[in-house]
Amino acid sequence: GIVGVNREFTAELAAAVKPIFLEIIMAPKFSEGALEVLCTKKNLRLLEVDMSADKKSHNQYVSVNGGLLVQQLDTTTVALSEDMCVTEKKPSAEQMIDMQFAWRIVKHVKSNAIVVVKDGKTLGVGAGQMNRVGSAAIALKQAEETLAAEGKDIRKEGLVMGSDGFFPFGDSVESAAQFGIAAIVQPGGSVRDEESITAANAHGIPMLFTGMRHFKH
């Protein structure tokens, strides 16, 4: 596997990942203690990455037949607020924190993207499916299996779902409700948004519309 962090890789972190089979670890810096631990692992590559703001690229390059597509990277996002709530039920303070986390994570997942989170942890990821309900099914199933391994029932955990694009129909909300999802954040903007809002209201699920999508192809 591959691990990447955005801060110094410490000896404590090195000890935590040592039992795991990894091929690459990326970090801005590795401490001396971390190097002592990690250099004992065979076939492990350590990459120091310059994460300075002035070193970051602002463009994305994709090869196409007969040419090259250059587009701006999606580097912006929005801070969530209760004013974005489109449902009768409003999210709790704890749910707002998890919704902001889900919105931040789903931005980096290949579209169509769905994430399921709780208490600042990603429990399920659905990526790259042809339709959004398919990605939702994958993310929900992953979350269910992750929690089941801990002896927990997904329907009792009050999880939060995030989507990088709008729900074209109400089916994704219905699927979320079947798994006990307690709050949803999505861009909104579908001509059938009302179907998703109606489904969320029927199940007592607070839902935010951010007004901004995060497609990653």
Description of each model-found segment:
Residues G1-H217:
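ATP-dependent carboxylate/acyl-activation modules
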